[in-house]
Curated annotation (Swiss-Prot):
NADP(+) binds at residues 167-169, 192, 233. The lineage of its organism: Bacteria, Pseudomonadati, Pseudomonadota, Alphaproteobacteria, Hyphomicrobiales. Its EC number is 1.5.1.5, 3.5.4.9. Keywords: Amino-acid biosynthesis, Histidine biosynthesis, Hydrolase, Methionine biosynthesis, Multifunctional enzyme, NADP, One-carbon metabolism, Oxidoreductase, Purine biosynthesis. This is Bifunctional protein FolD.
């Protein structure tokens, strides 16, 4: 049986945030440039509120300026777009993030398209998606960026490895595949319609699970010794009526088969905000020509 090592995303993210804070201090000292991140929250979604609170705390901890805009759930689309335009024009704001999901009456794609691509620190704008696809410098979605950072840290050179990404979302699956291609992996994108999904997964040296289905990837889907990146965050009921967090991979089954695996929680999750700060720092530098 293989001894499976958990990948500690929390520790890696803490180190990344510390390095970002050092770089921000140098920017402030040498260029009088304090990177600024604006976060826009529409409505009262509890999970979004917690996430925004965490973002604000970590932004301040990194020495960046944090701007929060909390709008009521019934905000008109024109008013939200006007705020985005105002932030696009504000030189103190280097990164703009509109927290998703938006209330149903707002067109998410239209709102995201209104953000200046140079300030699109979520990496969701079609310009950034297109730049990533053709191999140009782009602001990249935070979660897949964090996944690839963890992979490079633990595996070193990824060139030639077979990578299977289960999930084809614009937020994780597609950009993760693009980033792995950039590292010279041989990449397969699989999804719910893939024929013989377990067999496809068994070919993977790197298996990225990003489908949003609790424990869908079973232990016998994993190639012995493979590295498993579990992006899923799912709440499932416990016998006592409470809930627990699980990923898209059956973690207990993966132990003894995978070589490395990200646990849920504590794996990929902490990397997302750290990479948001990295993107804000990158955006600030590019806007100032540094």
């Amino acid at each position: 049986m293989i001894e499976t090592k958990p990948i500690d995303g929390k520790a890696f993210a803490a180190g990344l945030r510390a390095r970002i804070a050092e770089e921000v201090a140098v920017l402030v000292r040498d260029h009088d440039l304090k990177p600024g991140l604006a976060v826009v929250l529409v409505g009262e979604d509890p999970a979004s509120q917690v996430y925004v609170r965490n973002k604000a705390a970590q932004t301040a901890e990194a020495g960046m300026a944090s701007f929060e805009y909390k709008l009521p759930a019934d905000t008109a689309e024109a008013d939200l777009l006007a705020l985005v335009e105002k932030l696009n024009a504000d030189p103190a704001v280097n990164g703009i993030l509109v927290q998703l999901p938006l209330p149903a009456h707002l067109d998410s794609m239209k709102v995201l398209a209104a953000i200046d691509p140079a300030k699109d620190v979520d990496g969701f704008h079609v310009v950034n998606a297109g730049r990533l696809a053709v191999g140009l410098d782009a602001l990249v979605p935070c979660t897949p960026l964090g996944c690839v950072m963890l992979l490079k840290h633990h595996l070193g050179n990824l060139s030639g490895l077979n990578a299977v990404v289960v999930g084809r979302s614009n937020i994780v699956g597609k950009p993760a595949a693009q980033l792995l291609l950039r590292e010279d992996c041989t990449v397969t994108i699989a999804h719910s319609r893939t024929r013989d999904l377990p067999g496809m997964c068994r070919q993977a040296d790197i298996l990225v699970a990003a489908v949003g289905r609790p424990e869908m990837v079973r232990g016998d889907w994993i190639k012995p010794g493979a590295t498993v990146i579990d992006v899923g965050i799912n709440r499932v009921p416990k016998a006592d009526g409470k809930t627990r967090l699980v990923g898209d991979v059956a973690y207990e089954e993966a132990l003894g088969v995978a070589g490395l695996i990200t646990p849920v929680p504590g794996g990929v999750g902490p990397m997302t905000i750290a990479c948001l700060l990295q993107n804000t720092l990158t955006a600030a530098r590019r806007q100032k020509g540094l």
